[in-house]
From Swiss-Prot:
Belongs to the UppP family. The keyword DNA-binding does not apply. This is Undecaprenyl-diphosphatase. Its main location: membrane. It catalyses: di-trans,octa-cis-undecaprenyl diphosphate + H2O = di-trans,octa-cis-undecaprenyl phosphate + phosphate + H(+). Bacitracin is thought to be involved in the inhibition of peptidoglycan synthesis by sequestering undecaprenyl diphosphate, thereby reducing the pool of lipid carrier available. The lineage of its organism: Bacteria, Pseudomonadati, Spirochaetota, Spirochaetia, Spirochaetales. It comes from Borreliella afzelii (strain PKo).
Amino acid sequence: MINILNAIILGIVQGITEFLPVSSSGHLLLFRHFIHLKLPIIFDIYLHFATVLVIIIYYRQRISELFSTFIRFSLRKTNKSDLTNLKLISLILIITIVTGVVGTFISKYERMFTLPFILINFIITGILILMLEFKFFKIDFKDNILLVGIFMGLMQGLGAFPGISRSGITIFSATVLGFNRKSAFEISFLSLIPIVFGAILLKHKEFYDIFMVLNFFEINLGALVAFVVGIFSINLFFKMLNNKKLYYFSIYLFALSITVCYFV
């Protein structure tokens, strides 16, 4: 059973790490490992839902623009100015489908999600961030929406592995394909929205179970904390982005992995 303190801490962990390229799922599992707390995966999805609300608020104007474009497209009243938004909508749709397929496959191997596996993935994420920060290589495929969507969907799907940062790997793949950082972050965060809502729809029956098995108050407290902390976290992330200091996250992940290996 989860208590109030655990709910608050898990909410803080989720709120901070969701928007930072350090893997929120990896940190949640790491924390639960040390306090010997076992929770159903649907609890993590509920926390992700709380932080997705932060994304919706942060990008509310952009989402409104995309929704308006989609309505005009449905009514066949689009114009040339809608072309960019239609491409983004198409890209997010392809990414969502591919991610869903990959994520469903990976979810069948949850027994692999051991502590050493998570730590190795932390290191991989740290390396990807360094490659992103210092622009190790770049190819220009951004105009081919289908290929970009498939590639980014595959990469985002790998983010289902705890320790592999979903935002980190999608931002990395977007920049490799020729997108600038601002566009890469936008695609990464907006593509998370349908993924989380899709996961909720697929596991909607399990939501009833967690409210029956776990404490209703503690579950919602954790989600509320994740939401509030997430508001501050997303602003911190974009501030560090503007200052071009993402490599700090690589240093953190390397240090965390080494420290945990040493003491465990």
